[in-house]
């Protein structure tokens, strides 16, 4: 049968002609085009020198730990429920005694101004605006007091590495308490630094050195270098200056003799919530909870310490079944989407922590980039909850998620 054709009329075309107002702000246009955290990663890689990008992006040795952690979140199957009214969805609840708008917070990251000159202040501002906690690292490039002055609002946590000099460690704890931080994350998975081979190959130093390689790299990233050279010198705000690599500094300053017995001593010195970060076995989770901490973080340090370490997401349901009624469980490593966060909550986490996802946003566009990263995750959390047929986090449960493990059946860990 022949198709009848006619000459298009202007009035027929008019409804189809839709022109968006041009966006002349290149940063807004660039960030607005990012729909996923991986999109932000691609932007970050283009805009940041290789050594700085690799410091955030890389892991230990062959980087199998981080690859397996990400695969763990890919290898899940959701089980949605249907015909539920999901007009209104609430993605917040209490975490460690205080309300949070979303079930994730910003993880502690070291040397953050290396990635973007706005550094920790950008992360804290974005977190405060979103109603989620921000964690400041012992290896921060912004002083404790300076962060509070710049961002007086919002909930702040502090991540503590124990030093060989315990008096200096406790002096730092007292500063954190005086500044109004409410939670201390004691990191326990760094007796020595992991072998971060990208940093070694890139000649990563503190502060960055102007070698032939970095000068050549600077030619492709003039804005980054301009920011570095025209702002405060890049250094660890709470530590002494050091001419070597980050790993060498860790091995010189941090205490490899920390044991379970030290937790009670730390708890006696700290008035707020105490959380132990770096739990990788069920036995260790039991031992830490028995010592009266307020929470634990299942973490392999973002795959930056022991390569081939356990996947925290795989460990989560086993720890939650046994200890979920006795402590609050947080989890990190490999989280790149709102669906990842929802899966973790369904399997027993109270909160998740984002590290690289936050840093990709920071490198892509400073504070605006962090806002965009949080927005992407928030949108994903709420969309996934609606598609699962739940209206609040309390309705999520293991029946909504099945883990499909490529390394073999998931047995009960010890």
Curated annotation (Swiss-Prot):
Cofactor requirement: FMN
Domain FMN hydroxy acid dehydrogenase residues, every copy: 29-406
EC supergroup of this enzyme: oxidoreductase
Disulfide bonds: none
CDD domains: alpha_hydroxyacid_oxid_FMN
Reaction(s) this enzyme catalyzes, per UniProt: (S)-lactate + A = pyruvate + AH2
Top-level division of the source organism's lineage: Bacteria
Keywords: Flavoprotein, FMN, Oxidoreductase
InterPro entries per the UniProt record, alphabetical: Aldolase_TIM, Alpha-hydoxy_acid_DH_FMN, FMN-dep_DH, FMN_HAD, FMN_hydac_DH_AS
Keyword Flavoprotein: yes
One GO CC term, this protein: peptidoglycan-based cell wall
EC number in record: 1.1.-.-
Active site: 301
Positions bound to a 2-oxocarboxylate: 55, 161, 196, 304
PANTHER family, sorted: 2-HYDROXYACID OXIDASE 1 (PTHR10578:SF107), S -2-HYDROXY-ACID OXIDASE-RELATED (PTHR10578)
Miscellaneous comment: Was identified as a high-confidence drug target.
Record family assignment: Belongs to the FMN-dependent alpha-hydroxy acid dehydrogenase family.
Protein name (Swiss-Prot/TrEMBL): Putative L-lactate dehydrogenase
Source species of the chain: Mycobacterium tuberculosis (strain ATCC 25618 / H37Rv)
């Amino acid at each position: 049968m022949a198709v009848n054709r006619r000459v298009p009329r202007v009035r027929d075309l008019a409804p189809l002609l839709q022109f968006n107002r041009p966006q002349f702000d290149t940063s807004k246009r660039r960030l607005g085009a990012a729909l996923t955290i991986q999109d932000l990663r691609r932007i970050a890689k283009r805009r940041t020198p290789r050594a700085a990008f690799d410091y955030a992006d890389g892991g230990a040795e062959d980087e199998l730990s981080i690859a397996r952690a990400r695969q763990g979140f890919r290898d899940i199957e959701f089980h949605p429920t249907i015909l539920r009214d999901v007009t209104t969805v609430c993605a917040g609840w209490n975490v460690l005694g205080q309300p949070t708008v979303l079930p994730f917070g910003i993880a502690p990251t070291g040397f953050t101004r290396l990635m973007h000159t706005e550094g920790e202040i950008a992360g804290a501002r974005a977190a405060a605006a979103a109603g989620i906690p921000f964690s400041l690292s012992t290896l921060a490039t912004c002083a404790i007091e300076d962060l509070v002055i710049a961002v007086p609002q919002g909930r702040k946590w502090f991540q503590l590495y124990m030093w060989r000099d315990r008096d200096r460690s406790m002096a730092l704890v007292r500063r954190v308490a005086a500044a109004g931080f409410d939670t201390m994350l004691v990191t326990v998975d760094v007796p020595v630094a992991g072998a971060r081979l990208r940093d070694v190959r890139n000649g990563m130093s503190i502060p960055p050195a102007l070698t032939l390689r970095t000068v050549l790299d600077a030619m492709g990233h003039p804005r980054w270098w301009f920011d570095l050279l025209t702002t405060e010198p890049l250094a660890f705000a709470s530590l002494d200056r050091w001419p070597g690599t980050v790993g060498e500094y860790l091995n010189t300053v941090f205490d490899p003799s920390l044991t379970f017995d030290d937790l009670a001593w730390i708890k006696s010195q700290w008035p707020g919530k105490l959380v132990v970060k770096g739990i990788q076995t069920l036995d260790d989770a039991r031992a830490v909870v028995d010592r009266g901490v307020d929470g634990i973080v299942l973490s392999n340090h973002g795959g930056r310490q022991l390569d081939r370490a356990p996947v925290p997401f795989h460990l989560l349901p086993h720890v939650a079944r046994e200890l979920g009624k006795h402590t609050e469980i947080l989890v990190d490593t490999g989280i790149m989407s709102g669906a990842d966060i929802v899966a973790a909550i369904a399997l027993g986490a109270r909160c998740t922590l984002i590290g690289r996802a936050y840093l990709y946003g920071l490198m892509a566009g400073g504070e605006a980039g962090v806002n965009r990263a949080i927005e992407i995750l928030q949108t994903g959390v709420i969309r996934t909850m609606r598609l699962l047929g739940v209206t609040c986090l309390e309705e999520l449960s293991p029946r909504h998620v099945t883990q499909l493990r490529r390394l073999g059946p998931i047995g009960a860990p010890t």
